[in-house]
Curated annotation (Swiss-Prot):
GO terms for biological process: DNA replication. It is found in: Cytoplasm. GO terms for cellular component: cytoplasm. This is DNA polymerase III subunit alpha.
């Protein structure tokens, strides 16, 4: 035996989530570089990284040893938590590891952040496992350190009984507390009881210098600063992946511990099968699964053809039948008939149970079999879609249907699958959250104690690009790189962040991925559950699940399907009441001019995929007039086409500004016209790349899909091979070599931008359905859209504003009219949903609505409180209802209602108390007290109350519904602004033209520019719309005091377009509040009197009123109306006043009391 050989048997990767720092492949690479022959992975309580570790080890020529470190409570030492490391020696051992870990999660045995097993489970799942005792943290270790020698024999008896020859005393020498003491006692026990020992290093990080990074990672997980972390004391700087030589030297006094590490590695031989796929058997009774699929498909084809065509002639039938037979042949040959039938079954169940299902998504929409089985609603032949893009018979590929369900009912479908195939056979798929560039800077900065502002400003310099790394951030933001080079603190923070970037931080659940196993999931992979043992999730991610032979089914939630379903139900309910024919959203014509007129006008708010500002700009330029254009829109609106110039070419060709060629005016071929005609000669879709290869170069569609993939991946070797095949095939078809080369070059260029047409068609269909609903049933559609986003105030505000612009009346929230959701009344008005009122919640509202529907309308606040449970309808709920205007139906001032809450709640509690104890004798006196309370006088609804009322309304609704603060000043503002409301700004030719606007400030954000200058971004609301206003340093320095929430500002500046949103914004040149504007622009204040009011008594009242006003510069005039001649008089000079809000309030009251008119200019 070579005493310099050693194998690490206790190693934690970053899949231990907290306890390990290194990626499995990094551990393997270092091991190979150090000349090691084998390595283990023993993550804490999981096998998350087992497959990745296994595959990487084989890739690098290293023997993988699969294990896990577990915890359990030892009954021998007063139920204290202890550790064990388990290693699989064979397939049985690997299976038992899976069962042990899965059982721990299913039973929900959690202690702090760790899941635990029960020791007794080891007695039944012992086959194929080697146990390492756990060192100081093990059951034996803790017993030895406490000197409880009497318990040792009982402890060892268990391991001798069930793991004789497979149990090792683990020796760890990382210089932590008690390790040497334990080591000495363990070696003595080894000699006296003839138990073998083995050396490990309890590896947690790759290199010695990573210890600091490891401690920071632990502190991040704890949520404390580095110096406050306590758990880090459990670790040592020596827990890195040491060389064999270092380990042999470390245990030179106990050579058998080194030798046994190698011996154990030789005993561990796990082989994980791959390349075979396992699906549950679909019940076809006596028919073979293949023939059953053929029968179902042919029946489905007959129904589809009869539905789609008035007359099915022989040519049409053969076209579809030949395609169907081809697909069925491929599906059955590749062994996937069960997959299609399983998907067919749960989709049909969903439809039968009124759960909306999307028309398709991804390449699955290219399958005719899927269409005739009602898996999709897209006819692939009509839209020229390719099956081979979905399932390629010429390469190893798996079917993968992405299925959209109604967001609210998706879980019902998953529960149906669980019921059908068994709870033990169905699980969702795990995902791993990693430390991302922005987040890791914040986390590391916080742990190292840097100030919040410093961390925040630094993290903001990382671009928002999805998946961006810190390395990429340097190249994209030169300021970040400059700061890194010049500032030591920033350099330190980023250097640490780089080492933690990408490290696994937490586990999550795939958005829709579900696996269905032919037997128990644990026959293939371990499962993870929540702390109650529910909601099983595979411990392998989607790639590793596929490796072990399980196929993924995607159950995705799509909010738009919920909107469509809600709208259609509302529409059909009203149609049935009117004895009219109901609508079927899947049967609407795809060429209605009314829809395309709405689209061309860019009125796409609420329309699926088409409502962003950027998309609206593209719609405006393209002016789509057919369904194919909508398909193209979805494919064009991506960074590649937008940045490449492809979009401009497409638009210019559509409008005749550029010649249509197939595909290029210099290099084209007439054979490509049928393929490219619908996209004006532009290669837009991946399917077009495949068809061009088929037509020009004789590729099969399977081989054309391989070409497409090679072009997308830009693999130089593969591309060189494909180039030769393409040119040779084209020449065989009589195509000029030079032309073949040029067209291949064009294919290569556009393939990188090409989009999956099958996906684009399916989503274009959903887009069109929402467009059709908005065009034909706007109220129902908008109400449904609002309900679907009822918790998203910003979206509600946008949809309400859009509805008002469409001419739809919005009925404000009303406790006697509204429901939780938005709905449409018999006059096509939208009734505001109480669920959109901030801070109330679903249950209180449902409680109120249920009571109202059962026992009638509420007469007043007291009635409301006494008919509802005071524990559910709390003070907070009542305040929000009143502030939102939901109680305006009681015809009382909101301030008054707010003042009654205390009495109303008191009365309610007294009422329920009397009711509970059935003290009927008390009801008489209670009613008398209640009547006294109700006789309180109403408060005056003054102007200041109105302002507060609207401010509160905006606070709980996010918008103004019953009025607008700016309405009070509408006439006055016209004098300053020349009627330039936000809704009219789009009519301006706003280049180089300064204009003036006014609005109430509803949002204030501050940003710091690259030059360290502060800018402020305001959102102004003028009741007709919103406008973004940017204020730079110069103006900010002199006007910052004027900028306050809920205050009116008058802003002059220059309009331009936001580059990202394509929305209008203003760069401010000057800012005024109302007082400053009045000083600058108001000429006079005029009091208009009738002829009867020209008596001395009335003039004296006016005189007395103005005597108390502040002097200023605005003169006061009296305008007298006469039958024959009107006249105007200027008052004495001392009546020069300052127009303030206070004056306007008092004037408002004074003028109403005296029935006269006031004019401000």
């Amino acid at each position: 035996m070579n005493l310099e050989e050693f194998v690490h048997l206790h190693v934690h990767s970053d899949y231990s989530i907290v306890d390990g720092l290194s990626k499995p492949e990094d551990l393997i690479k270092k091991s190979v570089n150090l000349g090691m022959k084998a390595l283990s992975i023993t993550d804490f309580n999981n096998l998350y990284g087992a497959i990745k570790f296994y595959n990487a080890a084989h890739k690098w020529g290293l023997k993988p040893i699969i294990g896990v470190t577990v915890k359990f409570f030892s009954e021998l030492i007063k139920n204290e938590l202890t550790e064990l490391t388990l290693l699989a020696t064979n397939q049985d051992g690997y299976k038992n590891l899976i069962l042990l870990i899965s059982r721990a999660y299913k039973k929900g045995y959690f202690c702090e952040k760790y899941v635990t097993i029960e020791k007794k489970w080891l007695s039944e799942l012992n086959n194929g496992l080697i146990l390492l005792s756990g060192g100081c943290q093990g059951e034996i270790g803790k017993t030895l350190l406490r000197g409880q020698t009497s318990l040792i024999s009982d402890c060892l008896h268990f391991y001798e009984k069930y793991f004789s020859g497979f149990y090792y005393l683990e020796l760890i020498r990382t210089y932590r507390e008690n390790e040497e003491k334990y080591l000495s006692l363990a070696v003595d026990l080894s000699y006296s009881q003839n138990i073998p020992v083995v050396a490990t290093n309890d590896v947690c990080f790759l290199n010695k210098e990573d210890f600091k990074i490891h401690k920071i990672r632990i502190a991040i997980n704890e949520g404390v600063r580095l110096k406050e972390s306590k758990i880090q004391n459990n670790y040592s700087k020596h827990q890195f992946l040491k060389t064999e030589k270092e380990m042999c030297f470390l245990f030179s006094d106990i050579p058998e511990a080194i030798i046994n590490s190698v011996e154990i590695s030789k005993r561990c031989n796990v082989f994980i099968k791959s390349g075979q796929y396992f699906l549950p058997q679909f019940n076809t009774r006596k028919i073979s699964i293949e023939n059953y699929l053929i029968q179902k498909s042919n029946k489905g084809l007959k129904k589809r053809l009869e539905s789609n065509f008035k007359k099915v002639d022989k040519e049409i039938f053969l076209k579809y039948k030949n395609r169907l037979d081809t697909e069925l042949g491929i599906i059955n040959k590749m062994g996937f008939p069960s997959y299609f039938l399983i998907v067919m079954e749960f989709i049909q169940w969903a439809k039968d149970n009124n759960i909306p299902v999307g028309p398709g998504r991804g390449s699955g929409a290219g399958s005719l079999v899927a269409y005739v089985l009602n898996i999709t609603e897209v006819d692939p032949l009509f839209f020229d879609l390719l099956f081979e893009r979905f399932l390629n018979p010429e390469r190893i590929s798996l079917p993968d249907f992405d299925i959209d369900f109604c967001m609210e009912k998706r879980d019902r479908v998953i529960e149906h699958v669980v019921h059908t195939y068994g709870r033990e056979s169905v699980a969702q798929i795990i995902t791993f959250g990693t430390m991302t560039a922005k987040a890791v800077i914040r986390d590391v900065g916080r742990v190292l104690g840097y100030p919040y502002g410093f961390i925040n400003n630094l993290s903001k310099l990382v671009p928002l690009d999805p998946g961006i790394t810190l390395k990429d951030a340097f190249s994209k933001n030169s300021e970040l790189y400059t700061l890194y080079k010049s500032d030591e603190d920033i350099q330190n923070l980023i250097d640490v962040s780089k080492k933690l970037e990408g490290v696994n931080r937490n586990v999550g659940k795939h958005a829709g991925g579900v696996v269905i196993s032919p037997s128990k999931i644990t026959d293939f992979c371990p499962v993870y559950c929540d702390e109650k043992g529910n909601n099983p999730v595979t411990q392998f991610d989607k790639n590793d699940i596929e490796y072990v032979g399980l196929l993924k089914f995607d159950f995705l939630g799509l909010r738009t399907l919920t909107i469509i379903n809600c709208a259609v139900n509302m529409i059909n309910k009203n149609l049935l009441l009117s004895n009219k024919k109901t609508i079927n959203i899947n049967s609407i014509p795809l060429n209605e001019s009314k829809c395309f007129l709405l689209l061309k006008k860019c009125e796409t708010t609420g329309i699926f995929q088409l409502e962003s500002y950027g998309m609206k700009d593209l719609v405006k330029r393209l002016q789509p007039d057919c369904f194919e254009d909508i398909i193209a829109l979805i494919a064009l609106f991506r960074p590649g086409p937008l940045q490449s110039g492809m979009v401009d070419n497409f638009i210019n060709r559509k409008h005749g500004y550029e010649e249509i060629s197939y595909p290029d005016h210099k290099w084209q071929h007439i054979l490509l016209k049928p393929v490219l005609e619908s996209t004006y000669g532009i290669i837009l879709y991946q399917e077009q790349v495949m068809q061009i290869a088929q037509i020009l170069a004789g590729y099969t569609l399977g081989k054309a899909d391989i070409l497409r993939r090679a072009m997308s991946k830009k693999n130089i070797k593969d591309m060189a091979e494909q180039r030769s095949i393409f040119i040779e095939g084209a020449q065989k078809n009589g195509i000029n070599r030079k032309l073949a080369i040029k067209i291949f070059d064009l294919l290569e260029k556009f393939a990188g931008y090409g989009f999956n047409k099958s996906h684009s068609v399916a989503y274009a269909l959903v887009s069109y359905q929402t467009l059709w609903l908005k065009a034909h049933y706007p109220s129902e559609f908008m109400a449904s859209a609002m309900t679907s986003d009822i918790d998203n105030t910003d979206k509600i505000v946008m949809l309400v504003n859009e509805s008002i612009q469409m001419g739809i009346k919005i009925i404000p929230p009303n406790i006697n009219l509204s429901k939780y959701e938005f709905y449409v009344d018999h006059t096509k008005n939208i009734v505001y949903g109480l669920g959109a009122v901030k801070g109330i919640g679903r249950n209180p509202i449902l409680n109120l609505v249920q009571e109202r529907e059962k026992n009638g309308l509420f007469s007043d606040l007291f009635d409301l409180c006494m008919r509802t449970d005071p524990n559910k309808i709390t003070r907070k709920v009542l305040e929000k209802l009143i502030m939102s205007g939901s109680c305006d139906c009681f015809n009382k001032n909101r301030n008054y209602l707010l003042s009654l809450i205390e009495d109303a709640i008191k009365a309610s509690k007294e009422h329920f108390k009397i009711k509970k104890f059935q003290q009927e004798s008390l009801f008489g006196s209670f009613k008398e007290e209640l009547n006294i309370l109700k006789k309180n006088n109403n408060l005056l609804n003054s102007f200041s109350d109105e302002e507060k009322k609207l401010e509160n309304e905006h606070k709980v609704l996010g918008l103004y519904l019953t009025g607008h603060p700016i309405d009070r000043y509408a006439e006055e503002l016209k004098y300053y602004l020349n009627n330039s409301t936000f809704s009219k700004l789009k009519l301006f030719n706003h280049t180089k033209k300064k204009i003036m606007v006014a609005g109430i400030v509803v949002s204030i954000k501050t940003k710091v520019t690259k030059n360290k200058n502060r800018i402020v971004i305001l959102i102004l609301d003028d009741s007709t719309g919103l406008l973004e206003v940017v204020i730079f340093k110069r103006l900010l320095n002199i006007s910052e005091k004027l900028i306050q929430l809920n205050k009116i500002l008058i802003v002059s500046g220059f309009l331009n377009t936001n580059f990202i949103s394509k929305n209008l914004k203003m760069t401010a040149y000057d800012i005024m509040n109302l007082n400053l504007a009045r000083e600058k622009y108001l000429d006079k204040l005029t009091i208009v009197l009738t002829e009867k009011q020209r008596d001395k008594c009335f003039l004296k009242k006016i005189y007395q009123f103005f005597q108390n006003q502040t002097t200023g510069i605005v003169p006061v005039y009296i305008f007298c109306k006469k039958k024959d001649l009107d006249s105007e008089y200027k008052l004495i000079k001392k009546w020069l006043i300052t127009i303030s809000n206070k004056l306007l309030v008092e004037l408002d009251i004074f003028s109403k009391e005296n029935k006269m008119q006031i004019k401000y200019f």
